[in-house]
């Protein structure tokens, strides 16, 4: 007979103590500091900030430490903390054209105004384990040079000026805020992009990959990927003019997608857009690919792949929600299982006597 069992508070406290001990690890080894995580695991910090919805490197590093390096748990911690924060102001729209560039590449033009900047990247490495890191070797040395950044307009703006793409203009409508109003489907472009930015990187990467394998009409080129620092400004009510309050390291991706030939308009390329905190380049590219796939209805395209189904994609992109729903299966379901068990036994008895 299956009966309900109550877990004791002492057992739960002991489980938490065990987890804390595992998180700390061998006490003979130096403890990993939040500053070390922030500086040396910077790409993990970038992901937690992006999907956690807070652009604070120290808090993201703290969440990673507390979560024993579990990205999804760290994102959950950051989301929970975010709910306690007051909304003090709304920043002015970010101007990525004025980005202080750390990296900028284009796969469609070799020579672009402002030039290409390779920047920090794992591209072109051989993906061989570097065993010298086991010896806690010397810090790498860099040779730096001061140079003035040239104006670097977006590659898509160059295409638009040639009539090869459409300018995207601000409609003036108030953007949705998915942190205050739950999204409904079909949703606006602003809501869609917010959900994609906070969506799980692995999930979006898989969907983006599916569009490349034929599950969705998509023939992309990396028009431009740029990473760098963007000024953030607000307009205080008592002043009435914009005041710079800091800067953010962000990565922006614009994908040049297959052209369309709409009636009454010249044929032109379409685009997908991605924007993330830090240098999460893979996430930005995946976001841009899925963004374009979700624009299928706007271009009158027949949806042939899961990446083109807006509600399916966006309703399942949030890893905090997904992890929570899957994890709830670990909670006691004794009564539910007992009901199914009794039903199964009754069906078997009816079959045996039938």
Curated annotation (Swiss-Prot):
Organism superkingdom: Bacteria
Q: Name one GO molecular function term.
A: alpha-D-ribose 1-methylphosphonate 5-triphosphate synthase activity
**Listed GO biological process terms:** organic phosphonate catabolic process; organic phosphonate metabolic process; organic phosphonate transport
Entry GO CC: alpha-D-ribose 1-methylphosphonate 5-triphosphate synthase complex; carbon phosphorus lyase complex
List the EC numbers from the record: 2.7.8.37
- Has UniProt tagged this entry with the keyword Magnesium? no
Q: Which reaction does it catalyse?
A: methylphosphonate + ATP = alpha-D-ribose 1-methylphosphonate 5-triphosphate + adenine; ATP + H2O = D-ribose 5-triphosphate + adenine
Alphabetically ordered keywords of this record: Transferase
Pfam families assigned to the protein according to its UniProt record, in alphabetical order: PhnI
Family classification: Belongs to the PhnI family.
Note from the entry: The sequence shown is that of strain K12.
Q: How does it assemble?
A: Forms a complex with PhnG, PhnH, PhnJ and PhnK with the suggested composition PhnG(4)H(2)I(2)J(2)K.
- What is this protein's function per UniProt? Together with PhnG, PhnH and PhnL is required for the transfer of the ribose triphosphate moiety from ATP to methyl phosphonate. PhnI alone has nucleosidase activity, catalyzing the hydrolysis of ATP or GTP forming alpha-D-ribose 5-triphosphate and adenine or guanine, respectively.
Q: What is this protein called?
A: Alpha-D-ribose 1-methylphosphonate 5-triphosphate synthase subunit PhnI
The record lists the organism as Escherichia coli (strain K12)
Q: Which gene encodes it?
A: phnI
């Amino acid at each position: 007979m299956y009966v309900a069992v109550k877990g004791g508070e002492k057992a739960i406290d002991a489980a938490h103590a065990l987890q804390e001990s595992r998180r700390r690890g061998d006490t003979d080894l130096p403890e990993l500091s939040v500053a070390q995580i922030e500086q040396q695991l910077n790409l993990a910090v970038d992901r937690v900030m992006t999907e956690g919805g807070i652009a604070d490197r120290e808090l993201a590093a703290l969440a990673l430490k507390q979560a024993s390096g579990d990205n999804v748990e760290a994102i959950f911690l950051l989301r929970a903390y975010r709910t306690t924060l007051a909304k003090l102001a709304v920043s002015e729209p970010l101007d990525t054209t004025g980005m202080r560039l750390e990296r900028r590449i284009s796969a469609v033009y070799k020579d672009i105004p402002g030039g290409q900047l390779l920047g920090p990247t794992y591209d072109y490495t051989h993906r061989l384990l570097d065993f010298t890191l086991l010896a806690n070797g010397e810090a790498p040395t860099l040779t730096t040079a001061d140079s003035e950044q040239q104006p670097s307009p977006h590659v898509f703006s160059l295409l638009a000026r040639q009539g090869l793409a459409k300018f995207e203009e601000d409609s003036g409508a108030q953007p949705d805020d998915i942190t205050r109003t739950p999204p409904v489907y079909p949703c606006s472009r602003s809501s869609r992009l917010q959900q994609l930015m906070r969506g799980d990187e692995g999930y979006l990467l898989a969907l983006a990959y599916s569009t490349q394998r034929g599950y969705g009409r998509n023939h992309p080129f990396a028009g431009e990927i740029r990473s760098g620092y963007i000024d953030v400004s607000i307009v205080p009510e008592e002043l009435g003019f914009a005041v710079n309050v800091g800067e953010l390291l962000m990565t922006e991706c614009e994908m040049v997608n297959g052209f369309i030939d709409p009636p009454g308009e010249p044929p032109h390329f379409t685009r997908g857009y991605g924007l993330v905190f830090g240098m999460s380049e893979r996430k930005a590219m995946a976001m841009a690919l899925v963004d374009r796939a979700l624009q299928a209805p706007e271009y009158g395209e027949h949806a042939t792949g899961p990446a083109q189904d807006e509600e399916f994609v966006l309703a399942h992109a949030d890893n905090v929600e997904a992890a929570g729903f899957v994890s709830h299966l670990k909670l006691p379901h004794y009564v539910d299982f007992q009901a199914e068990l009794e039903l199964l036994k009754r069906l078997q008895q009816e079959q045996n006597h039938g």
